[in-house]
From Swiss-Prot:
Primary role: Potential regulator of CDK5 activity via its interaction with CDK5R1. Negative regulator of centriole disengagement (licensing) which maintains centriole engagement and cohesion. Involved in regulation of mitotic spindle orientation. Plays a role in the spindle checkpoint activation by acting as a transcriptional regulator of both BUBR1 and MAD2 promoter. Together with EB1/MAPRE1, may promote microtubule polymerization, bundle formation, growth and dynamics at the plus ends. Regulates centrosomal maturation by recruitment of the gamma-tubulin ring complex (gTuRC) onto centrosomes.
Pfam family, one: Cnn_1N
Subcellular locations according to the entry: Cytoplasm, Cytoskeleton, Microtubule organizing center, Centrosome; Golgi apparatus; Cytoplasm; Cytoplasm, Cytoskeleton
Composition-biased stretches (Polar residues): 1663-1706, 1754-1766
Tissues expressing this chain: Widely expressed. Expressed in heart, brain, placenta, lung, liver, skeletal muscle, kidney and pancreas.
Keywords, comma-separated and alphabetical: Calmodulin-binding, Cytoplasm, Cytoskeleton, Golgi apparatus, Intellectual disability, Microtubule, Phosphoprotein, Primary microcephaly
Region (CM1 motif): 51-94
Segments of this protein annotated with the region Interaction with NCKAP5L: 58-196
Modified residues (Phosphothreonine): 1001
Start and end residues of each stretch annotated as Interaction with CDK5R1: 1726-1768
PANTHER family: CDK5 REGULATORY SUBUNIT-ASSOCIATED PROTEIN 2 (PTHR46930:SF1)
Superkingdom in the source lineage: Eukaryota
Name by which UniProt lists this protein: CDK5 regulatory subunit-associated protein 2
Length: 1893
């Protein structure tokens, strides 16, 4: 087929298009395909018009040749069509079977997948049912909890109502105080005027005092001159005297006397005058000085008063300013209303005049003119009255509106108070939770202590047992020694016959007997008291009592040993036999009483053990039930931080179960919602043309509304697209702005609770919260992380706990750091503070969520008005822009109003009157509240306000501080004015750019609609007031957040009543540190880590506490967490640099053309805000580093801070002025350029590229700012760490490693900063710019490559349009970029190199655009030239008029028509095939999409199956662990019981030993009796050997008993050792069961009661062979009686435990009751056994009772028989032997009864749904797992079948497509063959259509 296509066909015309010679130089197409095929130009040869030359006429031969050629071509064409159809049929018949097979397989796979899906849904339904059944179990507990909660809520409501009443009273009092303050301001104004007048008078007085001082100086000078003149005159007088003395005159004496008199008189007068003048001058001078001092003091006082008055006047001025502002707003409203009234009156006057004119025209000719005038006057009066009434109604309505707004504000305040009370209740609840945790920890500690004590007691008991064994051994040796001594003393007894010694010894023994009686009585009482039942005490106290009883038993044994020594001594005398007999009777009675007490004690202990075991069993059953439920659910939910379930109580377990059930339900709903969203997305993927935009919008809206109903998501697609694209536009500009605010951190916690409640297209603020949260995380995380956080609330819980834990750590560190110069806190106060902070931090997030939701729903109505008022200057083009403004306004209002407005301005000074920091903050408030709302959203002056607040506490000079403060306020006012001016200029610039770029004019209706909205907003003063108050509160909170720590510390000095107000200030979320949100962490206002690190060093130097090491460890831990946060931040920055391009493309892709209109405004505003936020953050950091210095430096530092603030304010002013000048120049330039430019068309591709450039530049700037901040913070942290190392003893290696990590972080941050700043290294910015340049170059290269080859004129025109639009847009965009670059150079000190690179880039782009325009012009000219050549008239053709010629032409026309019809058929067939191909392609794409969907579902099903398998395995493992624990506890219980049994055996053995000793004593007593009888007889020697024989038999019996006792002790010790070995090995359950069966199978021999035929050798005893039964093969319990084989002789021998011959003993087989051995448990409350065993036991007990009664009778008859025997002096040994035999028979009966008792089993009967519950659960789980396996296998089969079917269908479609392609090529070839060769008939003529012509 390809040969037909590729071979050269002669019939094909030379030109590509139908026009001949349009493009002469274009080469032929390689494949021979005509680009204009199907257009109708080259399908038919126009022979009559094109092939014949116009100069030559056509003859008949030509016509005949033409006809024959046409016939041939027609025939060939038909043949080809026929063969083609046959070939197609053959090709289609071939591979159909394979296609059918694949189709069938695919169908099978689809069915299997459907089945699997159905089965999985059924499994999910089963799981939900199981969870609901579990939930029903805890229903009663939930109801109880609900009732308790209702009661608590009722109490809280009562409290809240009381507090509301109190607060209303406070409000009235505050209003009264306000009025008083208002009156006080007027009086203070008057006082200030008076003081100013007084000041002027004082100044005048001061000037008079200066004049007086000048006069005094002149007088002093005159006095000095007079003194000088006096001195000169005295010198003259002296000279005259000397001359006169030299003269010799007779009358010398007379003249000298006269001269002296004459000289003395004036001298004295002058001296007097001078002295008087001096005194006067001195007095005057003193008086003047005193007056000057008094005046100076008055001046100082006046100045002080003036300073205070200035301060007060400033405050009053501010208050007056606020009031005047309010009055101005009211006056404006009044003026507006007056203007409206005037307009209405003017309109009314005009209407009245019009009416009068009309009526005068009507009634000019009538006589009733005057009556009509009077009627009109009445009408006008009525209208006036109506107008008056309406105006009064308007006033009344305004008043009612004001009242309603006031009531609304009051209600909001009450709601906030209620929420505060709810927070307090939550805090109390969190306190209760903390106490519960503490109690749980204490319980665990107590358990550990109890276990340790049990171990200690076990060790003690073991030591006591070993000691008692040793003592028993010693006692046995002593007894043997005593028996030997008795034998020796029997011989010695015959020698002692002296009576005196007997009497003395008798007296001694009587005394000893009395003592022994007293002792035995004391022992009995002690024994009885010690053996009283312990009652309902714990096991621990019982074990203590057992140990004490054991010690008392040992003491009793010692005392009895002493008694036996006394008895041995007493045997030396023969006369003391009677006394010994009496004593033995008493001892026997005491022994009997003791045995009874021992039996009662054992019974009581058994009952107590049974009760305790029953209680434990019940607890373990309920405990295991709840623990199974909780562990199953916790395994299913994969909870990370769960406690061990074993330590929970029942209430906690029930609570846990209910919580987990709730979680499961929520997860199930989430799963359903996600399924819905996936299905909707898959459905929406095929709708409309805007597929990617809609997909992105629907994904985000449905993921935001994943937990909402379906009704709330029915929002218009256009609104969604506009909103989301605007969100994307604002995203990059709002990142830093959102990061610099603390409220955005709460968005992390709030966004899960937000709701989309507006169904008309305008979303509620909750959606914006989530949008803000996604914007926060957008630079750091990719989109999947945010979606995962939204869909998983448990992850959010974990993050919130981490954040709260970090907050708790930082607050714990910060608490107490401002106490350097104050008194130290006591540890108790510290603990209270820490607990207080903890409760606040625990209770905060939940309440904040509620506050955020409610507050924003309340504010939803008023906020869009604010946004429209703010944006009233801008041009709004479309409805989408209006929506964007709405949402922007809501976002800004949300940022401006803090959601947790816990600090109200009214209650702060009342609650915190003792805290100086609060007062300072409130004093400095009015300076900040004057800032305007738009720019004050960036908290620029937070730290200055803090320094002002601190100023009032420090002893700085008041004058300097007030001056600096006034200067700061002036600068703030100027800055505010400049900012408003700057914003107006920005708006003008944006308008000019919009007009220059040819934007559409804004809708007049929208522009006209804005002022009424503003007016409506102004009509509601309550709302405006609410906004103002919230903004001021926000500013207060911004200022107070930095002083939080000092307030916390000062609050501890205050009384505890003030502490209740502290939670409101602690609810500031800005102290939260999180390593996951590092960007928020860096740009947050309060950087606690730096303050902690610097202030912590001061604290470590000044405060030396006991827990210094813990403090240092805590600091190191905090530094490590901070380092981790920085490392995460660097990693996220790197990740962000990689993801930035993708994010930008997504942003540009979702943007529409109308959204691009508002971009420059947003961009400029965002840049301004980010730059100012960066500067603010740097300044905040600087002040925070300077903050925590030593107290000596604070005075100077405050002044320095204020000066620095002044400098920064001046710098900002200068910067604003420069920006304003620059903007003026830019506006002027734009207005000049606007005249020359016309609005051209723009292309979206160029816009997106320019937008990418601006966004990347903005991101580079933002990244540079973040790097600067983080580097500064890292440097401060390194310094703080060095100071900490110097101040404390930290491990050197750890500190060095930590310091190296810090240095590495700092170096990395410096590198990043250089990279962002310079851009010379291979950084993010250069990469993005280079990629952009390469992309543009590639586009231009392809364009230039396509220029010579473009065949159509439309393409060149489009390209020229594109190039011109590109040029015009780039010129505009580069101007914008130049402007943004200039602003960035001014604000952020960007590098000059980067600017030059941008300018160079712009120049190159302009050059290339100019070149492209030139090439477009050339192409246009060429096309015009070709068009002119094309329009040439075709030459006329000669027509012949012959009939032959006409017939030939008609035949030619007929053939031509036939040809055309055939061609049309071919074209139609090709079109049909094309349509079929398109349909097949569409069906194939649908099938591929469905296949992908099925594959995804299959993968999800597979994952779910794997998860279920994992959960099943984990549950099985957990069950095995529980079984193992139960087994271990059972082993422990069995071990304890075995020990108890061993101790009981030891006690019984001790009793037996005592009994044997008493029997020996009785024997010795009998011997004494016999000796006495013989002595009393006539001395004939020994008569008869019967008593001695009896004694001999008795002794033999005693020895046999002793041997038996020793063997029993040995067997018990071996049993104990083997039990310990078995328990130590931890053998399996079968072996343990075998051991218990074997232990129960060991039985005491069943001996028939034959008291007369007893022998010592035939006495039954336990042998060591009894422990051969521990073979596990023999210990298998038989299942039924029929299956138990009869025992052989060997078995009976091995089971019988007789040491002698087994003739008298019957075999004892361990019998299990049929079918009920599974119920056997050691904690059972029931006994199970055979009725034969029970009857035999009853028989043995009755026999024992009868024997005991006989023995009682014998003991009562014993003393009387002794007296009779003394009288008769005859031997009567019969009663003694009878008593001994009865004792042995009683012993045998007791042993037999004990053996019978062992044959009964303790069982726990199966209750309904209790016994096989666990097994049934495991069985159900296994069945479910197997079902799941089967379903999964079937689904996999289905999927495979569907895959095969789809592959088959793909192959079919491919085959069809290939066939169609082949047919298309054949048809094209056929068409070429049908065309004529004009050069064949006339080789001489040359066709103009050939390329050679």
């Amino acid at each position: 087929m390809m040969d037909l296509v590729l071979e050269e066909d002669v019939t094909v015309p030379g030109t590509l298009s139908g026009c001949s010679g349009l493009v002469p130089s274009v080469p032929d197409d390689l494949d021979g395909i005509n680009p204009n095929a199907g257009l109708g130009n080259g399908l038919l040869p126009n022979v009559s018009e094109e092939t014949v030359s116009p100069t030559r006429a056509r003859n008949m031969k030509d016509f005949e040749n033409q006809i024959t050629e046409l016939k041939k071509e027609n025939f060939n064409l038909k043949l080809r069509i026929y063969f083609l159809e046959e070939r197609m049929q053959q090709e289609f018949h071939g591979p159909t079977e394979h296609i059918y097979k694949t189709n069938i397989e695919l169908k099978v796979e689809v069915e299997s997948l459907k089945r699997e899906l159905q089965e999985r849904e059924q499994l999910l339904i089963k799981a939900s049912k199981a969870v609901e059944s579990l939930a029903e179990a805890g229903g009663s507990e939930i109801q109880r909890v609900k009732e308790d909660a209702r009661k608590k809520v009722q109490q809280v409501e009562d409290l809240l109502t009381k507090r509301i009443l109190l607060l209303e009273k406070d409000v009235t009092a505050a209003q009264a105080e306000l009025e008083k303050a208002f009156a006080g301001t007027e009086t203070e104004k008057a006082l200030r005027l008076r003081l100013e007048s007084k000041l002027s008078e004082m100044k005048k007085m001061h000037e008079g005092d200066l004049a007086m001082a000048l006069v005094l100086d002149e007088k002093d000078r005159l006095i000095e001159e007079l003194k000088l003149s006096l001195k000169s005159k005295e010198a003259l007088i002296q000279c005259l005297k000397e001359e006169k003395s030299q003269m010799a005159c007779p009358d010398e004496n007379v003249s000298s006397g006269e001269l002296r008199g004459l000289c003395a008189a004036p001298r004295e007068e002058k001296e007097r005058e001078t002295e008087a003048a001096q005194m006067e001058h001195q007095k005057e001078r003193n008086s003047f000085e005193e007056r000057i001092q008094a005046l100076e003091e008055d001046l100082r006082e006046k100045e002080r008063e003036i300073a205070t008055e200035k301060k007060n006047s400033l405050k009053r001025d501010k208050a007056i300013q606020g009031l005047t502002m309010a009055l101005k707003s009211k006056e404006k409203k009044v003026e507006e209303l007056n203007s409206e009234i005037e307009k209405l009156s003017a309109a009314f006057a005009k209407a009245r005049e019009a009416l009068q004119k009309a009526q005068t025209q009507e009634f000019q000719g009538s006589e009733d003119y005057e009556t009509a005038l009077s009627g009109k006057e009445a009408l006008s009066a009525a209208l006036r009255s109506q107008n008056l009434t309406k105006s009064t109604e308007n006033h009344r309505l305004r008043r009612s509106i004001k009242k309603i707004t006031q009531e609304l504000s009051d209600l909001q305040q009450e709601r906030e108070r209620l929420e505060k009370d709810l927070e307090e209740a939550h805090r109390e609840k969190s306190k209760g939770d903390c106490t519960i945790r503490d109690l749980r920890n204490e319980v665990e500690k107590l358990r550990n202590e109890v276990n340790e004590r049990e171990k200690a007691m076990e060790n003690r008991y073991k030591s006591l047992l070993s000691e008692s064994n040793k003592k028993l051994h010693n006692q046995e040796q002593v007894i043997k020694h005593l028996t030997e001594s008795t034998n020796q003393k029997d011989v010695l007894l015959q020698k002692f016959n002296e009576k005196d010694l007997e009497v003395i010894q008798q007296n001694c023994y009587l005394m000893a007997a009395e003592d022994l009686e007293l002792r035995s009585e004391g022992l009995i009482t002690e024994k009885c008291s010690s053996q009283q039942p312990p009652g309902s005490k714990t096991i621990f106290s019982k074990e203590k009592k057992q140990s004490s009883d054991y010690e008392e038993l040992i003491q009793v044994l010692k005392k009895e040993q002493d008694i036996y020594t006394h008895l041995v001594k007493s045997l030396q005398e023969s006369d003391s036999i009677n006394n010994l007999q009496a004593e033995l009777n008493k001892i026997f009675a005491l022994r009997k009483q003791l045995e009874q007490d021992v039996l009662s004690y054992q019974n009581l202990r058994k009952t107590l053990e049974e009760q305790i075991s029953e209680i434990r069993r019940r607890e373990e059953e309920s405990f295991s039930l709840y623990s199974d439920q909780t562990s199953y659910l916790s395994i299913c939910l994969e909870e990370n931080n769960r406690f061990q379930v074993e330590h929970f109580s029942q209430e906690e377990l029930k609570k846990k179960v209910s919580d987990l059930i709730q979680l499961v339900k929520e997860l199930y709903t989430d799963n359903q919602h996600l399924k819905k969203t996936i299905f909707d997305l898959s459905c929406m993927g095929f709708q409309g043309n805007g597929f990617p935009d809609r997909l992105a919008s629907t994904e985000q809206t449905e993921l935001l509304a994943s937990k909402e109903d379906e009704d709330t998501i029915k929002i218009g697609e256009d609104d969604e697209i506009n909103f989301l694209s605007d969100q994307h536009l604002q995203q990059s500009n709002e990142i830093m702005k959102d990061l610099s605010k603390g409220g955005c951190k709460n968005g992390y916690l709030r966004h899960t609770e937000s709701k989309i409640s507006d169904c008309d297209g305008a979303h509620a603020p909750g959606c914006l919260e989530e949008g803000a949260f996604i914007n926060l995380l957008a630079p750091l995380f990719n989109e999947k992380a945010t979606l995962l956080l939204e869909s998983r609330p448990d992850l959010l819980k974990v993050v919130r706990e981490l954040l709260l834990g970090q907050l708790f750590l930082t607050e714990q560190e910060v608490s107490g750091e401002h106490l350097d110069g104050k008194t130290e806190k006591t540890p108790k106060q510290k603990g209270e503070l820490v607990h207080f902070v903890q409760t606040n931090s625990f209770s905060k997030p939940h309440d904040e969520l509620k506050l955020s939701c409610e507050a924003q729903l309340v504010k939803a109505g008023e906020v869009p008005k604010v946004g429209l008022k703010d944006a009233s200057v801008q041009t709004v083009a479309t409805e989408g822009d209006l929506l964007r403004f709405k949402h922007e306004a809501t976002r800004e209002a949300w940022e401006e109003k803090p959601i947790n407005t816990a600090l109200s301005a009214e209650h702060r000074p009342e609650n915190l009157h003792g805290v100086p920091g609060w007062q300072a903050a409130l004093l400095s408030l009015p300076g900040i509240t004057n800032r305007e709302a738009k720019k004050s959203r960036l908290p620029i002056l937070i730290k200055p306000s803090r320094s002002l607040g601190n100023m009032y506490r420090l002893p700085a000079t008041q004058e300097v501080v007030t001056q600096l403060q006034s200067q700061i306020l002036e600068l703030q006012g100027e800055l505010k004015e400049f900012k408003t001016c700057n914003k107006q200029l920005h708006q003008k610039l944006i308008l000019a750019e919009a007009v220059m770029e040819g934007r559409p004019t804004p809708d007049k209706t929208l522009l006209n609609a804005q002022p009424p909205v503003g007016a409506a907003y102004q009509d509601s003063p309550g709302e405006q007031k609410g906004i103002k108050t919230t903004s001021s509160v926000w500013r207060d909170k911004e200022m107070d957040s930095d002083q939080q720590r000092s307030y916390e510390i000062d609050s501890e000095i205050c009384p505890p009543d003030d502490l209740a107000s502290l939670p409101s200030c602690k609810e500031n979320p800005e102290d939260v540190l999180s390593p996951t949100s590092v960007a928020t962490y860096l740009s947050s206002k309060s950087q606690p880590s730096a303050k902690v690190s610097v202030m912590g060093t001061d604290q470590s130097e000044s405060i030396n506490t006991s827990n210094e090491t813990e403090y240092l460890k805590q600091k190191i831990h905090d530094l490590e967490t901070e380092l981790e946060g920085y490392q995460n931040f660097i990693f996220q920055l790197q990740k962000h640099s990689q993801c930035s391009e993708a994010i930008i493309t997504v942003l540009c892709g979702t943007e529409g053309a109308q959204d691009g209109l508002s971009k420059p405004k947003n961009g400029s505003d965002g840049e301004e805000m980010t730059f100012s936020s960066l500067h603010q953050v740097r300044y905040v950091k600087h002040v925070k580093i300077l903050g925590p210095l030593a107290p000596e430096m604070i005075d100077s530092r405050v002044l320095e801070n204020l000066k620095q603030q002044l400098e920064e304010q001046e710098y900002k002013l200068q910067k604003e002025q420069n920006l304003n000048m620059q903007l003026f120049s830019e506006i002027h330039n734009l207005q000049n350029k606007f005249r020359d430019l016309s609005p051209p068309r723009y292309d979206s591709l160029v816009q997106s590229q320019a937008r990418e450039l601006s966004l990347q530049r903005q991101q580079i700037k933002d990244g540079h700012g973040i790097c600067v901040i983080s580097r500064q913070h890292m440097n401060t942290m390194i310094k703080a760490f060095e100071e900490l190392l110097q101040a404390s003893d930290v491990d050197y290696c750890v500190a060095e490693g930590f310091q190296e990590q810090l240095n590495q972080c700092a170096e990395l941050l410096e590198k990043l900063e250089k990279l962002f700043l310079n851009g010379k290294s291979v950084g993010v910015e250069m990469n993005t710019q280079n990629e952009l340049m390469e992309r543009i170059e590639e586009d231009n290269l392809t364009y230039q490559h396509l220029l010579p080859e473009s065949p159509e004129p439309s393409a060149s025109h489009a390209l020229s349009d594109y190039e011109t639009s590109e040029k015009s847009f780039f010129s505009r965009d580069q101007k914008q970029d130049n402007e943004t670059e200039k602003t960035s150079v001014m604000v952020n000190s960007f590098s000059q190199d980067l600017l030059m690179e941008h300018i160079q880039e712009i120049r190159t782009l302009r050059k290339r655009l100019e070149e492209s325009i030139k090439t477009n012009e050339k192409l246009r000219k060429q096309l015009e030239r070709q068009g002119s050549e094309f329009v040439q008239g075709s030459t006329s053709i000669f027509a012949s008029g012959s009939e032959l010629h006409s017939s030939l032409t008609s035949e030619i026309h007929f053939l031509r028509k036939q040809n055309q019809a055939l061609n049309a058929m071919l074209i139609k067939g090709s079109r049909d095939k094309q349509k079929e191909n398109d349909k097949l392609r569409e069906s194939l794409s649908r099938k591929t999409v469905s296949l992908e969907h099925l594959q995804r579902e299959y993968a999800s099903v597979k994952e779910e199956n794997e998860r279920l398998q994992k959960e099943g395995s984990e549950k099985e493992r957990h069950n095995q662990q529980l079984i193992q624990e139960v087994r271990c506890s059972g082993q422990e219980l069995s071990r304890v019981q075995e020990e108890v049994k061993l101790r009981q055996q030891l006690l019984s053995q001790n009793d037996k030993l005592l009994q044997s000793l008493r029997v020996e004593l009785k024997a010795y007593e009998k011997l004494d009796e016999e000796h006495r009888r013989l002595r009393e007889a006539s001395g004939e020697g020994w008569k008869g050997q019967d008593p001695f024989r009896d004694l001999h038999s008795l002794l033999m019996e005693i020895q046999a008993l002793r041997l038996q006792l020793e063997r029993s002790i040995e067997t018990s010790s071996t049993l104990q050792s083997r039990l310990k070995e078995q328990l130590a090995r931890g053998a399996e359950k079968a072996q343990e069961g075998a051991l218990t069966l074997a232990v129960q199978a060991v039985s005491i021999p069943e001996v028939p009661l034959q008291p007369d035929k007893h022998d010592g050798d035939k006495y039954p005893m336990e042998s060591d062979n009894s422990f051969d039964l521990f073979d596990s093969s023999q210990a298998v319990t038989p299942k039924s009686v029929s299956e138990t084989p009869p025992l052989s002789g060997n078995d009976t021998d091995s089971l019988s435990c007789d040491s002698g011959s087994s003739a008298t003993s019957t075999p004892c087989v361990s019998r299990l009751v049929t079918g009920h051995h599974l119920w056997a448990s050691k904690n059972g409350r029931h006994v199970l056994g055979l009725i034969e065993d029970y009857e035999a036991l009853l028989k043995q007990i009755s026999q024992g009772q009868r024997l005991l009664a006989e023995m009682d009778i014998q003991t009562q008859e014993a003393p009387s028989s002794t007296s009779q025997e003394l009288g008769t002096k005859g031997p009567h040994p019969a009663p003694l032997s009878k008593f001994v035999s009865s004792v042995s028979t009683a012993k045998l009966t007791l042993e037999e009864a004990y053996r019978r008792l062992k044959l009964l089993w303790r069982v726990s009967l199966p209750e309904d749904g209790q016994c096989p519950l666990h097994c049934e659960q495991i069985g159900e789980m296994k069945a479910e797992v197997t079902k799941l396996h089967k379903k999964l296998f079937e689904q996999e089969k289905k999927l495979q079948n569907t895959m095969k079917l789809l592959q088959l269908s793909k192959r079919q479609e491919k085959v069809i497509f290939d066939q169609l392609v082949v047919t298309h090529k054949i048809l094209r070839k056929a068409r070429g063959n049908l065309e004529l060769r004009p050069g064949g008939a006339h080789p001489g003529t040359c066709s103009p259509s050939r390329p050679g012509s």
